[in-house]
Each structure stands twice: as structure tokens, then as C-alpha cells.
Amino acid sequence: MKCVEVYKKLYHQEPFDVAFCPYRISPLGAHIDHQYGKINGLAINKGIHMAYHLKQNGVVELPSLNFPKRAQFFVSAVPEEKQGDWADHLRGTAKMLGEKYRLKVGLSGIIEGSLPIGGLSSSASVIICFLSALCKVNGIHLEPMEMILTAKAAENQYVGVSCGKFDQSCEVLSKKDHLLYLDTKDDSYELIPTSEDMKPYKVASFFSGLERSLKNSKYNLRQDECKAAAYALMG
């Protein structure tokens, strides 16, 4: 992991911990989660890593190996308005978590994505990776569904992306060699193991050469169009 190497060179010490959140793929279910449908997916062995240490003064200082500009803010005084950069995902996470729990400890380190941005729920991965680290340094334990909903709220209410809960659910609930089957209406789910009779397989993900950000795309418009189509079908 390059983030660990950079961390050691920058801070001349071993990190307190290295947080990780995987990316996910969705065989079936695009634009179904925000319409409360049933979807499936699985996490992969690539994702977001973050090498970090505690900051008792409550400051978050995180440069990214993938984006310019360092994220820097107090966990107890997150700006009300988003700043329009990648660090909005971190600010939104701290703000949503801080509405339920008292945050006193910040963190400093290096964050890194192992694949190009876009298409594999990298935004949700960044949020959950940071959320798990922020919880750890503040002694907070979140149950899986609370972690999923906190991460979703960061994107919905702060970043401004009207996503559903599939990305977060897949990244939190997935298990190796299992397929996640999730009903986004009642949050019930099943982890379906690979059948012993199934032939060996590999999942391939191809990069188109284009990077994207949902907050700068027509994602929210797609959600509105899905709702309009549902209303039309219902008569």
C-alpha cells in the first residue's frame, strides 16, 4: 500500500492503524436501490486505504494520493456548506456522525484509492473508510445498519447526491465468496455462498478511460426520472 509508505516518510513512524473499505460491483440493480427495489452485488479486493494516527486536538488533516488539496477541518466544527472538493465526503461524514455522537478526537494521515475514480462506488468507499477510522479514534461502535445509514446521509444531506443505500450496504455487509441479495425497502438481506457445483470464475472490471463524479453528473436527474416513470406506470 503506497499510503503506508508515504505515511512513514512523512511522519517517521508506523501508523496507528490502516483503515480499508472495498469497492463494489453490481451485477443487477443499478438505479433500483433508490426506488426501494431488490438488488445484488459483491465487494472486490480493491478499495480505499487510509493510514492514520490520532489528533487529540480534534483536527482532521488528510491529503489524498489521488486528488489535489488537503482535507483540513475540526471534527466539532464542520462547515455548514460544502466546499466543492473531494473532502466534502469527509466533512459530511464528520457532520452526520457528530449529530449523534460527541466527537473530540481527529486524525491525520494519508488516504489512497487503488483504482480510477468512478463506477465502483468510490465515494461511498471513501466515506466508510473515513467513518470507520473516525469511530475508532473516538471510541464509537456503530452497528452495520447505522454505519450504512450514516454514510448514506453524508452523501444525501451534505455532498448532495441522492443515492440509495446499495453501495454502502454492499461495502459493509459483503463477505468473501458470497453474493449480497438486498431488499432496500425493508433492509433485509441474504449472503448467498458460491455453490460447490459452480465452476471457478473471476470477475473482470474494465476502465473506460473516463473518470466521473456523481455530484457533477445527472445522477439526481436519473432518480427523478425513475420516480416519474413509476408514477406513470401506476396511472
Enumerate the predicted regions with their spans:
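Glycine-rich, charge-dense phosphate/pyrophosphate-binding loop(s)
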Residues: 18-24, 28-30, 176, 184-187
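Short secondary-structure capping/turn segments at boundaries of alpha-helices and beta-strands
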Residues: 14-15, 28, 36-39, 49
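Anion-binding (especially nucleotide phosphate/pyrophosphate-binding) glycine-rich loop
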Residues: 1-18, 46-148
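Short beta-strand scaffold segments in enzyme catalytic cores
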Residues: 26-29, 48-52, 169-172, 179-180
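Beta-strand residues in well-ordered beta-sheet regions across diverse protein folds
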Residues: 28, 51, 61-63, 182, ...
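FAD-binding core of FAD-dependent oxidoreductases
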Residues: 26, 33-36, 43-44, 86, ...
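ATP-dependent small-molecule kinase catalytic core of the GHMP/sugar-kinase superfamily
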Residues: 35, 140-235
